[in-house]
Amino acid sequence: MSITAEKKQEVIQSNARAEGDTGSPEVQVAILTSRIQTLTEHFKSHHKDNHSRRGLLMMVNKRRSLLDYLKKKDVERYNALIQKLGLRK
């Protein structure tokens, strides 16, 4: 249900603002998005797994709050990130 270390490093490198950046909101949102997508696939075959569903909802809420923070601080970075990750239609 979690993402592999290689996948996580790939996500970090593709969204980092600078070398070694792991804490910026963009990277955190990208990692959460990857984990959310993995859990969404998990629920297609395990629809009664309510314990993991709670974790999914917490991740979605954390991502939402990080996106709200980024939108408040820098709208251009926010728009670029949601475009890159395909979060809005």
From Swiss-Prot:
Keywords in alphabetical order: Ribonucleoprotein, Ribosomal protein, RNA-binding, rRNA-binding
Pfam families, sorted: Ribosomal_S15
Cellular component aspect of the GO annotation: cytosolic small ribosomal subunit
Recorded GO MF terms: rRNA binding; structural constituent of ribosome
Domain of life: Bacteria
Compositionally biased residues, Basic and acidic residues: 1-10
Annotated region described as Disordered, given as residue ranges: 1-24
GO biological process, one term: translation
Cross-referenced InterPro entries: Ribosomal_uS15, Ribosomal_uS15_bac-type, uS15_NS1_RNA-bd_sf
Gene3D superfamilies documented for this protein: 6.10.250.3130, S15/NS1, RNA-binding
Quaternary assembly: Part of the 30S ribosomal subunit. Forms a bridge to the 50S subunit in the 70S ribosome, contacting the 23S rRNA.
UniProt family annotation: Belongs to the universal ribosomal protein uS15 family.
Protein role: One of the primary rRNA binding proteins, it binds directly to 16S rRNA where it helps nucleate assembly of the platform of the 30S subunit by binding and bridging several RNA helices of the 16S rRNA.
Name of the protein described by the UniProt record: Small ribosomal subunit protein uS15
Species per Swiss-Prot/TrEMBL record: Novosphingobium aromaticivorans (strain ATCC 700278 / DSM 12444 / CCUG 56034 / CIP 105152 / NBRC 16084 / F199)
